[in-house]
Amino acid sequence: MNGQTPTDGGILYDATETDDEDDLVEVTEAERPAPAIGWAESLPEAAGLKGAELIQAFVKRLPNGPGVYRMLNEAGDVLYVGKARSLKKRVSNYAQGRGHSNRIARMVRETAHMEFVTTRTEIEALLLEANLIKRLRPRFNVLLRDDKSFPYIVVTGDTRAPALYKHRGARSRKGDYFGPFASAGAVGRTINSLQRAFLLRTCTDSVFETRTRPCLLYQIKRCSAPCTNEVSDADYAELVSEAKDFLSGKSQAVKATIASAMAEASENLDFERAALYRDRLAALSHVQSHQGINPAGVEEADVFATHHEGGISCIQVFFFRTGQNWGNRAYFPKADPSIPPAEVLSAFLAQFYDDKPCPRQVLLCAPVEEQELLAQALSEKSGYKVSILVPQRGEKKDLVEHALANAREAHGRKLAETASQGRLLEGFAATFQLPYVPRRIEIYDNSHIMGTNAVGGMVVAGPEGFVKGQYRKFNIKSTDITPGDDFGMMREVMTRRFSRLLKEEGKPDRSAEPGEDAGFPAWPDVILIDGGQGQMTAVRTILKELGIEDCVTAIGVAKGVDRDAGRERFFAEGRESFTLPPRDPVLYFIQRLRDEAHRFAIGSHRARRKKEMVKNPLDEIAGIGPTRKRALLTHFGTAKAVSRAGINDLMSVNGISETVARIVYEHFHEDAAK
């Protein structure tokens, strides 16, 4: 919105704060809130001012209505995003010279510019504030970390034989969705057990449509093979219905039905069928055994409990849907130690539900700031009433206490890990004679098979362990690299990584000490390369070409004799290669870093290879979408058979016109035509 000013004195109102001019709406006189300043409107009388004086200059023009404000430093970085019932009253508090915490005082001192937007209601301001904090990540706000979307289980509803899949993201496909689950691992375990219990297919639609005989899953009793009609449509529909009932919380009824069928089969001396029902019951019991506590009186709720100690806050979340426990997850939001736990939890909740569906009940371990306002905002956003409660007795109180115990345990583990990580980083700095303890270490590795589907992986570690949100993969694109040339691949990875970093961040200032509120650095202090002298030469050449050889310390880790762990040789600038004692904690630390880079690179390579393996030549043809692709594969069986078909044969397929048939034919015969 830079450079945009309201026309005719109008206010720029932007409910989502985007930078596109088309998204700016000029509010009419009838809709207009109290006069205020748009995000980008400048204030001439504030020129040259900073801190409390600048804030005071803005206060004079602020309205008493609700809105959102942003504080920025001289570089234009957003320091803080806040909302207010009255912008004038809230912002004027910052202009007071006394009564501020050290955190607020530092923030005020750094403020060189402010931006504001008015909203129609305080609820609207709260929702906008949460959205902006998640996107802009101001360093003085409470920040939700590891905000990955939750996985669901979906039973599809748009095919003859519904399938069972893990799903993330928008619910664009027709079907029944169950969740959220706390982790992908929990979904995987549940689907594995549901396969044994209900024998539903998990294959892709294209595989399902083209199977001519049952796959291995049918042989090991994990699927009923509807693809080849090994099960009737009616029987498969019954299995699907039972699976939906189980996932909807009707587990006892489903188990009773299967137990009755098992008893009937046994009475009829059909012991093979009875054994099948027995195995299905065991699979369902296995699912429930992993769910832990399953409350009878809580149908749909999220349970939050927080524990704050040692400058670290832990928020434990349990997910209950359809009366079942779908798991729990611990979060460690980034927050200044001076912020009260109730304020941390309140800010966390607003950001947590910014892009996630909210249950009808949210149970908390303690009251939070503006609890009623938050409930109203979540209700308005969800389209149904959301209650935020602090239970005092009964089953719900027990759930909160259980979550609080888990929060304390997770917090204790985190404190121990952080302390251990700090000691290891200090030992790492001493071992490699670094001038300071590294705050960001990047570890690189390549993965490929004979040069095919080559991928470079970068993992990141810091004072709090691995920072998975910073991981990056690099699909090797150079065509002039000899297949299997690890040095060439590493050169490409280094060039792409640091060229972009230079463009986005500029050279790091190593002479300045990081500030007390400095976030996680963008530039690495150290890069670890999985390789020996050859890899190090390639890396140093690139760093020198980019002019950053003095900005980053590069260290090579060569595998030991016979590739034995514990016998690694290290290569660092300005000293001979060396090894570390087998029991040195720093050696174990480096091995853990290298193994994580190896795992990530191999996983990225396998994902790319799998994608290439299932890639269909029909996907490359313009005008061939999923429907026509399915029709062609159903008619001809394989893509190779499609490539051999003539135009008349192609036209015989339902939905393929002469024009489309010619496009398909010419795609596969363009070389012959030349």
UniProtKB/Swiss-Prot annotation:
Subcellular location: Cytoplasm
InterPro entries reported for this sequence: GIY-YIG_endonuc, GIY-YIG_endonuc_sf, GIY-YIG_UvrC_Cho, RuvA_2-like, UVR_dom, UVR_dom_sf, UvrABC_protein_C, UvrC
Residues making up the signal peptide according to the UniProt record: none
UVR domain boundaries: 252-287
SUPFAM superfamilies named among the record's database cross-references: C-terminal UvrC-binding domain of UvrB, GIY-YIG endonuclease, RuvA domain 2-like
TM region(s), chain numbering: none
CDD domains: GIY-YIG_UvrC_Cho
GO molecular function: DNA binding; excinuclease ABC activity
Family the entry assigns: Belongs to the UvrC family.
Name of this protein: UvrABC system protein C
